[in-house]
């Protein structure tokens, strides 16, 4: 299919269809979605969730406490927002059931750059997917059911067409009232159209932004008299009115109010009756205008607190359904957000060295977390991401303990994703000769930006501490492993050999038995075994070798039982993995001839160096980054 025919087909599928009122009522009998409310249609567009049994995934089970969570494919691009999205869907579900939420404003409250606007845009896109029915010509897209009275007509409509009475709760607009008089009460003359909500054409979807106190009035919401028509109609005539307000255009759909509490309070008054009574007054002496849609608003915390603290606004506050949209607090999800942003830019194919996005995500997440008591914030960040720190940080608490201590406002402060993406833009363009990003440039750019942003002294020191105390030292360790891994061709096999030998020697040492090497026949007594074990333990600074050896041997014996008698991999036990890596890489001098970019003494050294660079490139670095990061690592190690 060509792009032209594809476009034409898509355009044709959204064009309005016309029915008689009788045909519409017959359709109601067959299909309940014909008279569905805006909330019901949004639920249809969102679709059914995927139920995730977190108990089956060790990481998710720690994050969500083994609960079954709902994930909606419609929101798959919104990472780390399960709780927030679940609350939004709950609001629509309750509103669709005709509960109190139907009369409330859905209000997204969160910090700048936290995703409120993106959520609002997504909801507007979703509501465009499901059509609704309106009386042809109605300037406020009102439902044909608005012609009927629940008390007078409800029983007949329910019996003949299966329409529940709760759907007959809207009034007629002044425009319909005038047409009805013209038709002499013959409602069969009304035609019904099937419409698709449209952001572009403002059909069932509208957006309002705050204006200046002096130049914005309620006409932005309710419309105003069209002065061009005053030659033909009196001022209070329904046909002289311009139904251009956001409430008019969003009837049977969704109205978004951006930064709602920045608007003058007088502008917000029509929202009170629109939510509670399903109608609002015009600016002229017309009858009330119906509204049967969703009101969606969002703003930052500072405006909300100012508004809430004013006692005059209590009636309004009672009509608000708050959904908090905090910053993402999981590093892995923050990385997915950066990946999404990069994918939608020209940097999608630019080189990004390993650990760059992770380091930036760790920094931004650390800035959003509240400092825990009796535990370090870096461990808290790792626990929030679902890591198990039982073997590496005994002081680390459970995710629930951290959350309880932090309170409900965690994630409402800190650095935004916008800030992070601007940092990323600078890092990718840092080198004038290569569009690429790496953690060394990231550390430099972050430090410069922290100085330039003019944060409060306490915040500035806190952010610099994150860089110097947590991120830089861990990156030195990370890039060291990357370099050393590329240096050692048989890295995995070598590590497994050390692991197997350590477990074997430790087992014999614990049992106080001599060990005879089956290949050489050499006998190692308990003293000799201890010396061999210490060669592995000392570089890692193991303070209590006896307990450590017992712990490792017990772990391996349990693992063998589930692995057909074979040893587990050397990576399977965090504590011993760290010990083995430190043993393997304790001698940096061995690396120097291979990883340095100086002239080589021999062809053999040059070949080893070339092989090292090739393996680093295979791991995701550019040639230029290999040189930069290797030289940076050697400088840092030398200074230490």
Residue ranges and their predicted role:
Residues 34-640:
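Conserved ASCE/P-loop NTPase catalytic core
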């Amino acid at each position: 299919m060509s792009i032209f025919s594809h476009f034409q087909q898509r355009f044709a599928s959204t064009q309005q269809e016309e029915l008689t009122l009788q045909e519409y009522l017959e359709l109601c009998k067959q299909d309940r979605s014909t008279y569905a409310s805006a909330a019901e249609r949004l639920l249809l567009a969102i679709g059914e969730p995927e139920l995730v049994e977190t108990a089956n995934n060790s990481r998710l089970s720690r994050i969500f406490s083994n609960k079954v969570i709902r994930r909606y494919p419609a929101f798959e691009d919104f990472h780390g927002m399960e709780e927030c999205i679940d609350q939004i869907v709950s609001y629509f579900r309750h509103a669709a059931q005709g509960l109190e939420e139907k009369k409330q404003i859905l209000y997204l409250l969160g910090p700048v750059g936290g995703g409120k606007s993106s959520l609002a845009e997504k909801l507007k896109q979703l509501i465009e997917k499901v059509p609704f029915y309106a009386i042809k010509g109605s300037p406020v897209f009102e439902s044909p059911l608005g012609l009927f009275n629940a008390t007078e007509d409800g029983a007949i409509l329910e019996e003949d067409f299966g329409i529940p009475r709760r759907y007959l709760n809207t009034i007629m607009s002044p425009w319909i009232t005038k047409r009805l008089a013209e038709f002499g009460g013959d409602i069969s003359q009304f035609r019904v159209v099937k419409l698709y909500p449209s952001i572009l054409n403002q059909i069932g979807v509208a957006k309002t932004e705050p204006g200046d106190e002096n130049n914005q009035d309620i006409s932005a919401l309710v419309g105003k008299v069209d002065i061009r028509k005053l030659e033909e109609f009196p001022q209070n005539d329904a046909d002289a009115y311009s139904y251009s307000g956001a409430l008019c255009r969003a009837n049977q759909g969704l109205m978004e109010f951006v930064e709602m509490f920045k608007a003058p309070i007088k502008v917000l008054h029509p929202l009170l009756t629109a939510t509670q009574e399903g109608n609002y007054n015009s600016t002229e002496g017309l009858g009330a205008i119906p509204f049967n849609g969703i009101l969606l608003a969002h703003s930052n915390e500072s405006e909300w607190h100012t508004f809430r603290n004013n006692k005059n606004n209590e009636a309004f506050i009672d009509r608000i359904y708050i959904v908090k949209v905090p910053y993402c607090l999981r590093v892995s999800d923050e990385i997915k957000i950066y990946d999404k942003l990069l994918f939608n830019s020209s940097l999608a194919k630019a080189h990004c060295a390993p650990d760059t996005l992770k380091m930036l995500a760790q920094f931004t997440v650390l800035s959003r977390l509240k400092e825990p008591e009796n535990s370090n914030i870096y461990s808290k960040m790792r626990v929030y991401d679902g890591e198990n720190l039982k073997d590496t940080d005994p002081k680390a608490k459970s995710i629930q303990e951290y959350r309880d201590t932090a309170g409900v406002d965690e994630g409402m402060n800190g650095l935004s994703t916008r800030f992070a993406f601007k940092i990323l833009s600078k890092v990718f363009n840092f080198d004038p000769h290569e569009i690429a990003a790496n953690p060394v440039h990231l550390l430099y750019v972050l430090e410069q930006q922290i100085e330039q942003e003019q944060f409060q002294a306490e915040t500035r020191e806190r952010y610099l501490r994150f860089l110097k105390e947590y991120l830089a030292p861990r990156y030195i360790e990370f890039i060291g492993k990357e370099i050393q891994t590329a240096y050692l061709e048989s890295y995995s096999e070598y590590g497994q050999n050390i692991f197997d030998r350590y477990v074997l020697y430790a087992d014999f040492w614990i049992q106080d038995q001599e060990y005879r090497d089956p290949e050489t026949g050499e006998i190692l007594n308990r003293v000799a075994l201890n010396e061999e074990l210490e060669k592995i333990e000392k570089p890692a600074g193991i303070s209590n070798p006896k307990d450590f050896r017992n712990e490792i041997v017990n772990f391996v014996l349990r693992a063998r039982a589930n692995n057909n008698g074979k040893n587990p991999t050397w990576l399977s036990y965090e504590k011993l993995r760290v010990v083995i890596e430190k043993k393997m890489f304790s001698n940096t001098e061995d690396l120097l001839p291979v990883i340095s970019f100086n002239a080589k003494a021999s062809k053999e050294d040059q070949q080893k160096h070339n092989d090292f660079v090739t393996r680093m490139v295979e791991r995701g670095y550019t040639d230029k980054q290999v040189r930069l990061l290797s030289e940076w690592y050697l400088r840092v190690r030398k200074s230490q």
